[in-house]
């Protein structure tokens, strides 16, 4: 670097901005700053943010005077080069900014801004009593009075412009936390250890002490237990954890406290890892002939550097194959990412993996605290053995892998892999495929019901295809019966929402001490409350959707924005008190079934009952141990769960999913119904699945009944080709949003017509979606269809250009445009 040349840095800020911003590096930071590091920069009139150094260079910005970087937050790069490439691909492919990707990717503890609020830690939350500088004491005194302060307030109080270095030091001393941390304070987990005071470590002094304690037998016993725990008298007399010492001695904590006060023992707090798990307790699993053939075929696909699609029946033993592939990668010293679509799946699979791989297995998903996620992040970045096998939802893609050898995407067909809000609106499976190329690693997609796109790529030779066509251990596929609700209703045989076939089979299943699963893709008690006189229905005040009744809290709730209200005693239109519940959800199923068969032990598994960190784990454990006879659930019970004693699975209403206005409706219905049915009879006894419907002749139900994926696919791919839908086209959805539907109509029509000048018949709409207003914003969609052979990059570049021109020519106020590439909804 030339001595007189000025160093500049392009910074990624965690904001939805279309470009990077260039800052000047002050001389005193030139030897500290490196690319991909976090820095503090000013932005706007008074705000400050932590950003990532994208690039260092000597080119001054031509449009403005560059402002100075204020501080460097890390000694080393925060992210690695592969992560940056991955960020850039996400931003380009999904048409969003690098700042939006950064905001979604980094744990909240790594993001600071001038809007961050600081508060003091309570006494007892602090690890010790550190020495304070005058400024630190000044800030703490102010916090004790105010409770919390913005960074601007702290700056004014301390009398300095840049407060980040001081606050960083105070955070390290455990004096203060930021608002991101208040939700889940990021601090090392600690455990108290006890060691003997130095003055008693000589044998003579220790004997004198033992004689003195003969008059205090409980303290004497505790000292002897300590010596036993540290292998008797020796020069080191190493420490023992407080928890273990009290357990071994049987002493009460008050006895230990007395000895601490006397100075016999000294207590110290030590940081320990949150990354749990025991050592591995089992060797590798043995595979059947069919599994062994599939494993060898997968390895063949890996040797050809292809994406591998494993198409295995429900209950065919895909997980055992996954575990062998994991073992191969770990034996090579590589990191492994095992992706699952649903948090509910993790507890069961984690238990199986930890038996095989012990502490190497770690979990990364949103239900875990910021503390735990940060420790997993750090373990992955350091290539620690604790964290060499990561099990997680789609966000686990963003971890700082350095030696990634294998990615497995289980249930690859699942729509939960798609991020809807906020940006980047990425598809986890597709992002994983790109990432496998970036890291030059193997990738396996596994499912019993492949997505139409993945199967198409497998049949065309783009992916390597492996079929596992028999269930593990000789288990038979479940028999699937269709219950005709129209006929049963006509003959007045229905008992509420239950067909006679289902009730009879439920009773028989329980009598045999077997278990049942009931599926309904709607939580809550009833879909809606309706006036029996004028048919008025309470709607959300912010969304164009009826409110769902939740009996447990006796409230009506919106599942889009969270709005809730008390149940009205009379109609909001005609004031009639004749209000009726229409439809049914998981709560109502539970209540009705309890009244029909009171002896059943019933539990629900939906978002309402699994909100806590371990809510789903407790339910799965209780069901596994047969403390529950019937498990009622939403779609989370359809995905990969494996129970020994489930003989009956029932779908209470198949019609709502079959009738959904979306080109993927048949695909989703076939996948969901097949997956739910596959939970039954996964051991030697055959299972039974019952699907209740008003349309028993529906072709999707026939394919499901006959376990006929090929028949479903041939029909579906023909329809997609005929009407121009993926995989024969690519889709981009433009959602224009505004508070006024009248203004939105006008603006959306203008935008649609403007884009047709360039894209012609490839532009469809604008149209209102089924739910046309969410969170007080009306929305209209414009769909862009792109031929599969066309350059998607060129189309997106041109689309961005035309959208920018449109908003330049028509400067609309109060509008929001959301772009969704490869939309699922």
Predicted features and spans:
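Inter-lobe coupling/hinge segments of SF2-like helicase ATPases
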Residues: 282-288, 292-296, 304-745, 753, ...
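A short, contiguous, amphipathic alpha-helix enriched in charged residues
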Residues: 8, 33, 743-756
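A carboxyl-terminal module marker
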Residues: 753-778, 817, 821
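Solvent-exposed residues in well-ordered beta-strands and their adjoining turns
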Residues: 14, 26, 737-739, 785-787
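Short amphipathic alpha-helical segments
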Residues: 19, 241, 730-732, 778-780
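Solvent-exposed, membrane-proximal periplasmic/extracellular interface segments of envelope transport
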Residues: 57-66, 70-76, 672, 769, ...
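Accessory, non-ATPase domains that flank or precede helicase/AAA+ motor cores in DNA-metabolism machines
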Residues: 1-447, 461-475, 758, 792-825
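Short secondary-structure junctions
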Residues: 597-600, 755-763, 808-813
